[in-house]
């Protein structure tokens, strides 16, 4: 009996020990769901702080943040929270002795209370954001486990941008955008207020900027929009609305940086005041995307209006910066403008690039006199950088490197890692987006400080910014979708706690954060669960390879076009593609599909999987899967050119297909693209040749521009039946973009996807 009792005690001790280990592991996991992850977090074993009952917040040195915290806690916990001079949840001001530790704060939790020590008002706000995430995480248990956090930001500039010109978003929607930034400790909001497609800020001294420039003709993308006036689409912010948004941002410790574009992207302004152009107009507010040739003419009337605009802008925005654009300003009109050419001579300038530099420097001098500094896109480097300018490096990291080495500050927002208008998953299962791809892991991998900089130069890198251009984003739910979850990766990069080896941990925290987004009814992409498909060729056969970043899920697929279910085949190895088929695949967790279905159509012809030789290489940005792209049985998506297309700039496609052995055929088919706003044009002619020896070719069919223009992008060439081993296809590009079109005189782009032989 005594022995039995002893065994029972031993078992109970083991159960209690295992329970403690489970509890402690759960606590540790829960606290590591913070985004961005703090610089230093230590879990204590000293109990927890209760969240039940009435709570008291002691304001201490940070009354504003204490009030904010009390209000947020009442909403979260549905309980009374009292604000007093002191209390178990309390604030204290401390000195930050390390300059590199921006917005330093400490957060300590134990059974006696919650202690926040912060170096600045913004640091106290960020401590509150961390605490609120902890409260949300532990709300169900009724207490927050004891812990200690010592945290700070690596970068002083942690920015996000929203383009409200291409598509307009209300002041309340902008406030929501600010809410999202503040949760993840972002502190700069770049408000893109003017562009070719709309002028969005009220300027009382020049009312036509909004009366005319804020509205454009309705196009298909906005035909159902409520944001219309007199049959036109658009809108603008009154100065009172702007003041309200700025005050709202200030409470969230976010600085709003307004952008007034110059000298390019000015067609909305020129529609209102055509006399500010080189030609005199008339102009319409832009209804298409791309780069417009008509820009501000650098004459006194132009500078007078822009100075009036700046006078009103500086009274609305307390920001240290005004962004003046400076990007994508074609010199087409300036080259043929008598006034511009006279100004080049008068000012002793070398060319139109130096004229742009003159334009920017003149406006910088005026803005500096108002106590502000300018930011410009990296094109402001052309012709010489303005003395006090900060460079926003978007075309790559080179602009930031150049600026930092010259002693100028730079903000890193390269198109490769920071453009949120790009697809974040497979274009076939994602909403329409710009023609490129930017997945969550690539955002997370970005290091804002280029390795080319030494320690002193690196101090000029203020931080990263992600840009939300809205050509294809017509409503705010779509903005949310493109923002989340990539904003989470951006926040960790900007805070300085992203690490390549920690991506898996970050990914798990993102998935955990989806529950919060669901509760708040925030729209977000689930591309993190999506499958990736890759076409491979082995020993003359084609296969479709599937992969997923969530290795604990099961991939199931079908080849008959039906949707996959839990009864569908389990993917174990690449699927053989030996006939025309549709493969549908998806991730499954237990009996539930997670993410979207990956669909891939294959259309097999006699050329599928064969060897191809090109006379001219495609542009390095649009090489897709090389020559295999032309014979993989997959048609390209005309909204996404990075995959399944070959792109040529100023070159023909001349492709010779080795059919391996002589075969009979009488048709060749290919797809091409005509998107003139993107400088992409249909070819001028297509010719098909055949050969037995790859030396002597015979022309069997050709079509010209008239037929191609009627083809709707699919060119079919039929001819008498041939029996040959080699097929050569020549696709002749448009030599120069015609006058009157964007990019006039430049080489046209040519895009071709599949060369099908039947």
Tell what function each PLM region has.
Residues 98-321, 362, 366, 465-469:
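Feature activates predominantly on carbohydrate-active enzymes
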Residues 497, 501-656, 673, 682:
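Short, compositionally stereotyped local motifs that mark structural "simplifiers"
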Residues 28-158, 368-377, 381, 385, ...:
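Acidic, contiguous N-terminal accessory segments
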Residues 1-33:
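Bacterial Sec-dependent N-terminal signal peptides
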């Amino acid at each position: 009996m005594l022995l039995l009792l002893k065994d029972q005690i031993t078992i109970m001790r083991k159960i209690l020990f295992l329970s403690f280990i489970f509890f402690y592991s759960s606590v540790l996991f829960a606290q590591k769901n913070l985004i961005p992850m703090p610089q230093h977090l230590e879990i204590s074993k000293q109990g927890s702080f209760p969240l039940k009952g009435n709570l008291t917040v002691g304001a201490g040195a940070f009354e504003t943040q204490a009030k904010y915290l009390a209000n947020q806690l009442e909403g979260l916990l549905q309980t009374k929270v009292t604000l007093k001079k002191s209390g178990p949840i309390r604030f204290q001001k401390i000195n930050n002795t390390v300059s590199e530790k921006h917005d330093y704060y400490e957060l300590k939790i134990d059974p006696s209370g919650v202690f926040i020590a912060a170096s600045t008002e913004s640091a106290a706000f960020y401590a509150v954001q961390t605490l609120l995430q902890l409260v949300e995480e532990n709300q169900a248990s009724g207490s927050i486990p004891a812990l200690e956090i010592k945290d700070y930001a690596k970068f002083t500039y942690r920015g996000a941008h929203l383009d409200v010109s291409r598509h307009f978003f209300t002041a309340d929607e902008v406030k929501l955008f600010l809410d999202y930034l503040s949760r993840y400790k972002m502190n700069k909001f770049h408000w893109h207020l003017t562009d070719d497609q709309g002028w969005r800020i009220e300027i009382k001294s020049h009312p036509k900027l909004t009366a005319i420039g804020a509205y454009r003709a309705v196009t298909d993308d906005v035909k159902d929009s409520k944001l219309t006036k007199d049959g036109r689409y658009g809108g603008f912010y009154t100065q009172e609305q702007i003041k309200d948004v700025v005050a709202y941002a200030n409470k969230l410790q976010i600085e709003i940086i307004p952008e007034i574009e110059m000298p390019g992207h000015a067609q909305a302004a020129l529609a209102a005041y055509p006399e500010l152009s080189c030609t005199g107009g008339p102009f319409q507010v832009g209804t298409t995307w791309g780069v417009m040739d008509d820009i501000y003419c650098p004459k006194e009337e132009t500078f007078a209006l822009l100075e009036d605009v700046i006078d009103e802008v500086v009274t609305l925005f307390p920001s240290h910066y005004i962004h003046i654009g400076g990007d994508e300003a074609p010199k087409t009109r300036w080259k043929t403008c008598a006034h511009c050419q006279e100004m080049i001579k008068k000012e002793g300038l070398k060319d139109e690039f130096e004229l742009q530099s003159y334009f920017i420097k003149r406006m910088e001098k005026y803005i500096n006199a108002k106590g502000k500094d300018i930011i410009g896109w990296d094109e402001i480097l052309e012709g010489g950088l303005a003395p006090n300018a900060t460079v926003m490096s978007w075309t790559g990291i080179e602009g930031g490197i150049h600026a930092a080495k010259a002693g100028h500050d730079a903000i890193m927002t390269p198109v490769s890692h920071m453009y949120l208008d790009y697809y974040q998953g497979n274009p076939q299962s994602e909403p329409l987006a710009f023609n490129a791809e930017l997945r969550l892991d690539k955002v997370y991998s970005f290091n804002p400080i280029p390795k080319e900089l030494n320690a002193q130069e690196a101090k000029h890198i203020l931080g990263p910014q992600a840009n939300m251009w809205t050509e294809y984003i017509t409503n705010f739910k779509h903005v949310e979708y493109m923002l989340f979850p990539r904003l989470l990766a951006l926040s960790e990069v900007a805070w300085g706690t992203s690490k390549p080896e920690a991506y898996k941990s970050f990914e798990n925290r993102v998935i955990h954060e989806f529950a919060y987004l669901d509760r708040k009814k925030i729209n977000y992409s689930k591309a993190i669960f999506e499958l990736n498909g890759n076409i491979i060729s082995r020993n003359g056969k084609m296969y479709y390879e599937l992969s997923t970043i969530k290795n604990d899920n099961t991939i199931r697929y079908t080849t008959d076009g039906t949707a996959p279910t839990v009864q569908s085949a389990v993917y174990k190895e690449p699927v053989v593609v030996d006939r025309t088929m549709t493969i549908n695949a998806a991730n499954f967790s237990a009996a539930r599909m997670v993410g979207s279905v990956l669909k891939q159509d294959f259309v097999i012809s006699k050329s599928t999987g064969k060897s191809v030789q090109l006379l001219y290489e495609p542009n390095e940005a649009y090489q897709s899967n090389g020559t295999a792209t032309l014979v993989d049985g997959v048609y390209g998506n005309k909204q996404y050119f990075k995959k399944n297309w070959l792109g040529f700039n100023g070159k023909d496609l001349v492709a010779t297909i080795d059919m391996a052995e002589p075969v009979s055929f009488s048709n060749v088919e290919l797809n091409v693209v005509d998107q003139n706003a993107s400088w992409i044009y249909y070819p001028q002619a297509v010719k098909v040749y055949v050969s037995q020896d790859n030396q002597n070719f015979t022309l069997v069919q050709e079509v010209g521009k008239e037929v191609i223009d009627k083809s709707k992008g699919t060119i079919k060439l039929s001819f008498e039946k041939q029996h040959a081993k080699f097929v050569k296809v020549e696709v002749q590009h448009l030599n120069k973009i015609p006058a009157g079109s964007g990019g006039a005189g430049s080489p046209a782009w040519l895009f071709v996807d599949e060369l099908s032989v039947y």
